[in-house]
Amino acid sequence: MNAPAEARRQLDELLGGLRESLGVDLVGLYVHGSLALGCFNAARSDVDVIALTARALADDERFAVVDLFLRVSARPYGAEAHVVAREHLRPWRYPPPYDLHYSEAHRERLLDPDAVLARPQDGDPDLALHYDVTRRAGVALHGPPPDDVFREVPRADLEDALRRDFEWCRSAKSVLYGVLSPCRVWAALTTRELHSKATGGEWALARLPPELRPPVERALTSYAGAGEPVELDEADRQRLLAHIERALAATPAMSQPGPA
């Protein structure tokens, strides 16, 4: 795994803190996302991890783990973390259940003790995508190899999660989620291969008509660079999304035979 020194330090702190808080009940800690896929960008990427535990967290453990995430995240890179127990993986359920979710978007909410103690009532479709990346490309910082832990996600559930992601992207304004994520969904559903935002954007660029390429070209340049702001014309973005939507409508379901 090619990671900046600061990201490695954050991962070491997360692993050390989880070991201290959970002891032998920490089964594994797995890196997924851009670090695992080799497209981490220090200007905009998060440190994505899944912590696997032997059982659901007790109340005092929830406070300790959230405090750890609050201390480590955004110093300097944001942390995106799910805590899942073994019981959440077997039997398979969709959307996948989980015990705790942290991201910088949840930082303020998790300063409230009641929010820390609240057990999630619904699953998270995004976890199906995270499990797929982790199984196929993830890095185990602690615990068994990823493909020994995470079973193959049923194709129908993977497709549903990808299509939900596309729908969510409609209202996203950022380069990552408003342009490159829809391209990644298109590439993943068409090729049935693992794609990052970067590879999805490149794949889409080779298949788009010339008039729809500029938003993707600008997004890829920014994504690969220092996070330079990109001016996106919303009308151009909506035309891009409409084209991808038409392509997705003609794409066979993942449960059907794939491309030869």
Whereabouts are the PLM-identified features?
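A generic structural motif
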Residues: 2, 53-57, 186-189
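Amphipathic alpha-helical interaction surfaces
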Residues: 185-188, 192, 210, 250-253
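Conserved NTP/Mg2+-binding pocket subregion across the NTase superfamily
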Residues: 67-172, 179
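Short, charged amphipathic alpha-helical segments flanked by flexible coils
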Residues: 193-222
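Helical scaffold of the NTase/Pol beta-like nucleotidyltransferase catalytic core
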Residues: 1-30, 60-62, 255-260
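Catalytic metal-binding acidic patch
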Residues: 29-69, 78-85
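Hydrophobic alpha-helical packing segments in soluble, helical-rich domains
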Residues: 163-198
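Terminal (often C-terminal) interaction modules
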Residues: 221-260
